[in-house]
Amino acid sequence: MQKLKQQVFEANMDLPRYGLVTFTWGNVSAIDRERGLVVIKPSGIAYESMKAADMVVVDMSGKVVEGEYRPSSDTATHLELYRRYPSLGGIVHTHSTHATAWAQAGLAIPALGTTHADYFFGDIPCTRGLSEEEVQGEYELNTGKVIIETLGNAEPLHTPGIVVYQHGPFAWGKDAHDAVHNAVVMEEVAKMAWIARSINPQLNHIDSYLMNKHFMRKHGPNAYYGQK
């Protein structure tokens, strides 16, 4: 697990480096599917003092199997998403400014241009609000459930992120670094959408044929963007 702990540590350290977190906000995890174990950031530990050895290993029920700290308070959300979506290898949660602003507004981040379409096939959805019962009960587990409810049967890697109403963004990917990459992009396109709609409140979504082209040339079966 040392290699995965190092990867998760590095991915967590990328959050302040890319300006996605303040203080101890945010967390990144990754899963070892063969062993059924998840590595995640410890709860409330400052990034400046954090080490790879501090990463916490939990099983799929959330039981700590390695580590001296409590795991992130959002662990149950991560585990619920891993259980539902076998294609996920890494998950990140932040309170990055612009993506969180869309979450607080209760609005999906609209697909307005090709930067968005290069990574997200359509709008980045916003969940419904959790009920008082859901919040007072198993809050973090229910956060995962409302994300799954919103995504439905969609392929999560085609829309590798979501904003949870009145909370903030979650993003995911093939591994921890890919998840952070998608979280960085989500914050950037959230900012772009806010600026664009401020300039032109009547701005329409990106044309579907242009969105399809940009997404498929990077992620489709005949993708040709980048190097083999």
Curated annotation (Swiss-Prot):
Pfam families associated with the record: Aldolase_II
Any one Gene Ontology BP term: pentose catabolic process
GO molecular function: aldehyde-lyase activity; L-ribulose-phosphate 4-epimerase activity; zinc ion binding
Catalytic activity: L-ribulose 5-phosphate = D-xylulose 5-phosphate
Binding site for Zn(2+): 74, 93, 95, 167
Domain of life: Bacteria
Disulphides: none
This protein's record includes keyword Isomerase: yes
GO-annotated cellular components: cytosol
Active site as annotated: 118 (proton donor/acceptor), 225 (proton donor/acceptor)
First-level EC class: isomerase
Manner of cofactor binding, per the entry note: Binds 1 zinc ion per subunit.
Binding site for substrate: 26-27, 43-44, 72-73
Keywords: Carbohydrate metabolism, Isomerase, Metal-binding, Zinc
Cofactor or coenzyme needed: Zn(2+)
Triggers of expression: Induced by L-ascorbate. Repressed by UlaR.
Pathway given in the UniProt record: Cofactor degradation; L-ascorbate degradation; D-xylulose 5-phosphate from L-ascorbate: step 4/4
EC code: 5.1.3.4
Family statement drawn from the similarity comment of this UniProt entry: Belongs to the aldolase class II family. AraD/FucA subfamily.
PANTHER family: FUCULOSE PHOSPHATE ALDOLASE (PTHR22789), L-RIBULOSE-5-PHOSPHATE 4-EPIMERASE ULAF (PTHR22789:SF9)
Described purpose of this protein according to its UniProt entry: Catalyzes the isomerization of L-ribulose 5-phosphate to D-xylulose 5-phosphate. Is involved in the anaerobic L-ascorbate utilization.
Protein name stated in the entry: L-ribulose-5-phosphate 4-epimerase UlaF
UniProt lineage: Bacteria, Pseudomonadati, Pseudomonadota, Gammaproteobacteria, Enterobacterales
Record gene name: ulaF
